[in-house]
Amino acid sequence: MAGCIPEEKTYRRFLELFLGEFRGPCGGGEPEPEPESEPEPEPEAELVAAEAAEASGEEPGEDAATVEATEEGEQDQDPEPEDEAVEEETATEGEEEEEEEAAAPGHSAVPPPPQPQLPPLPPLPRPLSERITREEVEGESLDLCLQQLYKYNCPSFLAAALARATSDEVLQSDLSAHCIPKETDGTEGTVEIETVKLARSVFSKLHEICCSWVKDFPLRRRPQIYYETSIHAIKNMRRKMEDKHVCIPDFNMLFNLEDQEEQAYFAVFDGHGGVDAAIYASVHLHVNLVRQEMFPHDPAEALCRAFRVTDERFVQKAARESLRCGTTGVVTFIRGNMLHVAWVGDSQVMLVRKGQAVELMKPHKPDREDEKQRIEALGGCVVWFGAWRVNGSLSVSRAIGDAEHKPYICGDADSASTVLDGTEDYLILACDGFYDTVNPDEAVKVVSDHLKENNGDSSMVAHKLVASARDAGSSDNITVIVVFLRDMNKAVNVSEESEWTENSFQGGQEDGGDDKETHGECKRPWPQHQCSAPADLGYEGRVDSFTDRTSLSPGPQINVLEDPDYLDLTQIEASKPHSTQFLPPVEMIGPGAPKKDLNELIMEERSVKSSLPERSGAGEPRVSFNLGSTGQQICRMENLSPVSSGLENEQFKSRGKTASRLYHLRHHYSKRQRGFRFNPKFYSFLSAREPSHKIGISLSSLTRSGKRNKMLRSSLPWRENSWEGYSGNVKIRKRNDIPCPDFPWSYKI
């Protein structure tokens, strides 16, 4: 081809840098050095010693002669034994010449100058399986190449091209040197290939091809469609990471397909009982897909057959290597404007179109009626043991592997196809560690909120989804792949403009005040290539789950106040139910007090007040108090004396039956399931005289746990023994510290 693509310069530069770091299997990064190279340093050391002795004018044998002479005393000073010494030197010289002649074929007479030590190279990827069959060579070769190239952040298009060229070279070479013939019962069994030797051959071919492409780069056309992806995976609370995922946006380049529309392949595999089945499926399923006869005209059926072939071959491998594991899997294959999905088990994929979740599949679980009937027809059973399980063991009804559970747990995949009309937003592929705790609508909200907060930047969307699943209580491995089917930056801008028009006359925003003025012009450009978050095995960068909490908060959602700096408690209307934004300073607890009992209590308090000595400020006006529980009927009393705080004293106990009716006014706090238990000192309502506006004085708040309301307060340092009080225009500021999980709000005066 005479043309030149814009990326060629970038690709050449990458190859130059890559060759500077990657010197092939013989450049120091070999998994296991050749055993023949170990005994070489010994003769080289002897030769260097001999050369040094010659350079100093002494014979190599003189040292030994000198030692012998020293042991004999002063005999070496006598002139008589000179002939004997000459004979010894001659014999020693003859022996040295014989040694030099024997070492001459292997070493040159003059040792080469010492070469500078090269920096240590990163280890090459090692194959996880010791032996493979001939049918598995292609998948293993492609996987080894892609692992090595992606480790150096190779562009996806170039990585696919290099992996394809390397795999073709390996397949055309003679693999008989790597074969291990195996005999069983006197008959020739399956011929297997040693993967370590195959890996050396693969990396040697890769190095040769990179050197050739630097000089003469084969020009190719770049794909027209390139899907933006965001990937994140964590081990979470499990001891091992058994999830695997695959992203091949350049499917045509990886398999050298020139007559097909643009194609892409994405998959998530969730292993159980070990990671071998998940690794095997991630390496070989897409290869088995391309090799199916119906792949050109019926990709959905080809996907189902690829699952079946992968399952059969892994069961054979498990029998040879005594493996007892399996994996679920979900695959999405995009060809042009068609989306094809195939799956086994409970890993799932969902489509989002115009901001709404679209169901594409139903996971294979034992509690599905059709799956239960299939299992029982085969002689199995579905029982409840913490979850619905097949024969009391596995909680999935279909999987790759699990040979000991066949045929009840089969590897037959289901498939579905959907036409993409351009209104689709993105796909979310994930394992059950995500979908068991996050429903589709919540996932859509998490993605939407993240895109709005980050001006359409989608690189960390998968991280946000994983964090939401973990905060919702997931302890399993979590893997999430988000594939964006269109430019979400434009979609976010359009939605923001429409929301701004709708909310411009409603007196404020509901997005936490993050309007155009706070964001400014900090929009990030849309990435031009795949932007995938690293699929690490741990959970990086997380200090506390509060930072990543989204709509899945277990407590009530805290809405942002109109004025973010302070709140005027005297402006609260008793006729409106109180939200979790704030509560008035005096709030009753329980289902609501009878008016009769409240009036009796208030009248008695008036009599108590008349008997108390007059205090300063007693004649000042008093504001109203709201008595009752949140969201229920509220009794409003104007210009009354403050409510007594002594509900636990003798006066309360002397009320008899009336006290029992007022029991719900007493503070009661049940033991929490998690965390610590509060033990407040005061069982009283908020009542204070001359409120101070100094920072550090806390107000009490009403909290809810289960079906009970509780009101907790700390002591008021300016008047600890106050029996009455009033409230002026009290301004309070929100606290910056993280409150107790049971307190959805916290303020300071």
Curated annotation (Swiss-Prot):
UniProt EC number: 3.1.3.16
Protein's GO biological process: cellular response to lipopolysaccharide; cellular response to xenobiotic stimulus; positive regulation of stress fiber assembly; protein dephosphorylation
Compartments where located: Nucleus; Cytoplasm
Lineage per the UniProt record: Eukaryota, Metazoa, Chordata, Craniata, Vertebrata
Region feature (Disordered): 21-128, 495-537, 608-627
Function: Protein phosphatase that inactivates multifunctional CaM kinases such as CAMK4 and CAMK2. Dephosphorylates and inactivates PAK. May play a role in the inhibition of actin fiber stress breakdown and in morphological changes driven by TNK2/CDC42. Dephosphorylates PRKAA2.
Protein name: Protein phosphatase 1E
Key words, A-Z: Cytoplasm, Hydrolase, Magnesium, Manganese, Metal-binding, Nucleus, Phosphoprotein, Protein phosphatase, Repeat
Phosphoserine modifications at: 532, 545
Region named 7 X 2 AA tandem repeats of P-E: 31-44
Residue span(s) of domain PPM-type phosphatase: 224-485
Catalytic activity: O-phospho-L-seryl-[protein] + H2O = L-seryl-[protein] + phosphate; O-phospho-L-threonyl-[protein] + H2O = L-threonyl-[protein] + phosphate
Acidic residues: compositionally biased ranges: 31-45, 69-102
Ranges of Pro residues composition bias in the record: 110-126
Sequence repeat intervals: 31-32, 33-34, 35-36, 37-38, 39-40, 41-42, 43-44
Principal localisation: nucleus
Amino acid composition bias (Basic and acidic residues), ranges on this chain: 515-524
Listed Low complexity bias regions: 46-55
Free-text comment on the cofactor: Binds 2 magnesium or manganese ions per subunit.
PANTHER family: PROTEIN PHOSPHATASE 1E (PTHR13832:SF535), PROTEIN PHOSPHATASE 2C (PTHR13832)
Highest taxon above the source species: Eukaryota
Disulfide bond annotation, renumbered to this chain: none
Subunit structure: Heterotrimer. Interacts with PAX1 and ARHGEF6 (or ARHGEF7).
Binding site for Mn(2+) 1: 270-271
Family: Belongs to the PP2C family.
Binding site for Mn(2+) 2: 270, 432, 476
Entry annotated with the keyword Magnesium: yes
